[in-house]
Amino acid sequence: MTILASISSIGNVKSITKSKNVSFSSSSPSSSQSLNSIQYSPCGGPTLGNVVGNLVGGVLIGTGVIVGSVLNTVGTITNPILHPSCGCN
């Protein structure tokens, strides 16, 4: 009885691990999409709507997207200062 219980609990742990991996892998394409949408924004930087949208999307999907979106926002604000030439890279 205890052997069967431990095997079933191991099976549950594996299924939980798989579902976590799926959720993280599903959030990485959206973080790259938000990176692309900010990267190709005008020289003035991202609009407030884009920044708020990325932050709200990050709260709904996971903390990795929040960190990525904040770093991308900082990059787009400092990029025109460090590289004054405008346009997509």
From Swiss-Prot:
Tree of life domain: Eukaryota
InterPro entries with a match to the protein in the record: HssA/B-related
Pfam families in the cross-refs: Coiled
Intrachain disulfide bonds: none
Family statement drawn from the similarity comment of this UniProt entry: Belongs to the hssA/B family.
Protein name from the UniProt record: HssA/B-like protein DDB_G0295685
Organism: Dictyostelium discoideum (Social amoeba)
